[in-house]
Amino acid sequence: LSIRRQRQMCIRDSPYPFKHLAGVGVALKLVLALGGESREDALFARYCTLAAIGTIADVMRMEGENRTIAFCGLEALPHTDFVGVHALLKEAGLLGKPITSVQIGFVLAPRINAAGRMGAADLAADLLETDDPARAEELAKALCDLNRERQAVEQAICADATEKIERLRAEDRSALVLSSEDWHQGVVGI
């Protein structure tokens, strides 16, 4: 059987009621299960902010458990005890402001994702793990810088692609597939 078919079979056969849980939601559920019932509320309160950021960043369906995680995480985000998340909120100009899924999707998530796209995923991981406020501030600034770099690279790719299209005759534009060896692999899919 193909891997895709095997996955479909597993999903259909699974007794779990919500089939569209984000990967970060699965990780949260694992933490809760390993922590035990007596620690479930405390663990959820601690990690729901990270799970909300991941759920929103992955553009998951906002229904069922994804919605609960996102709602609770957004509510808890301004009071997070994750030093790195706090530093990123500050560096992004969101500290003390109401946080919605829009701020996550268009402000925080792009900064976190820029690290991986630009070949420095360790910076995002370090930011989320650090307990040192000075280090968190340094990492948050680095992520914001990488995001600006990612935006510039993305704009250059778009300009190059537009130029390639404009050089084509109108009758050759019905279906387009563009590429360039010069386009950054981490950004080209955006």
Regions found by a protein language model. Give the residues of each.
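Single conserved hydrophobic/aromatic residue that forms the stacking wall/gate
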Residues: 1-11
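Short, conserved glycine- and acidic-residue-centered signature motifs
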Residues: 3, 20, 184, 188
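Short glycine/threonine-rich catalytic loop with a Thr-x-Gly-x-Asp
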Residues: 16-23
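Amphipathic alpha-helical segments in well-structured domains
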Residues: 23-24, 70
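Hydrophobic helix-and-loop "lid/oligomerization" segment in the mid-to-C-terminal part
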Residues: 36-190
